[in-house]
């Protein structure tokens, strides 16, 4: 039986490092819409929804034919935002994919390959690359501390 897969794109206007980052434009199109349009090319996602904290984002999303759900400004991170957004959807999905809203160049084939990898390797819950030494002190890159079995202990900047 085919698994139902939902892509959720968390985005918020109150970015600390770059003010109103989702609204910044590349070739006249907001960054989060570029991300949405690229993710929409996935061959595996059954649905794709933007989870956001501001009506401005909802209105822009509608102009591009994107689905969007308003979430609380109190969400501490993207994971909380997609969880809150998912609770508002009246559909069941087998898998939920977190697609960061500031990835305008995301390759839809990579989305599909990560989903396929996870379906084949059911114990994997987070799939990510290793970090380069020169990026250890960079606050723009999330770091993961894992145990000897590769299980995530915590995430930090």
Task: Give residue ranges: language-model regions.
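N-terminal glycine-rich phosphate-binding loop and ensuing alpha1 helix
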Residues: 4-52
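Hydrophobic/aromatic residues located in beta-strands of well-ordered beta-sheets
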Residues: 7, 48-50, 96, 127, ...
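Short beta-strand segments
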Residues: 10, 98-100, 129-130
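Short glycine-rich anion-binding loops that position phosphate/pyrophosphate groups of nucleotides
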Residues: 13-15, 101-104, 133
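Short, high-confidence coil segments that cap the C-terminus of an alpha-helix
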Residues: 45, 91-93, 121-124
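Short phosphate-binding loop-to-helix
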Residues: 49, 55-116
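Conserved core of the sugar-phosphate nucleotidyltransferase
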Residues: 106-157
């Amino acid at each position: 039986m085919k698994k139902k897969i939902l892509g959720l794109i968390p985005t918020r206007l109150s970015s600390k490092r770059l003010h109103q980052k989702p609204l910044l434009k590349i070739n006249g199109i907001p960054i989060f819409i570029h991300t949405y349009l690229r993710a929409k090319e996935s061959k595996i996602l059954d649905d794709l929804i933007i989870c956001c904290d501001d009506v401005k984002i909802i209105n822009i999303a509608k102009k591009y034919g994107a689905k969007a759900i308003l979430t609380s400004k109190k969400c501490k991170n993207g994971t909380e935002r997609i969880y809150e957004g998912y609770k508002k959807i009246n559909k069941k999905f087998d898998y939920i994919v977190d697609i960061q809203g500031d990835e305008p160049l995301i390759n839809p084939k990579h989305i599909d390959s990560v989903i396929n990898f996870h379906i084949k390797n059911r114990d994997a819950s987070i799939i990510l690359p290793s970090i380069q030494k020169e990026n250890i002190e960079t606050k723009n890159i999330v770091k993961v501390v894992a145990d000897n079995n590769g299980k995530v202990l915590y995430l930090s900047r």
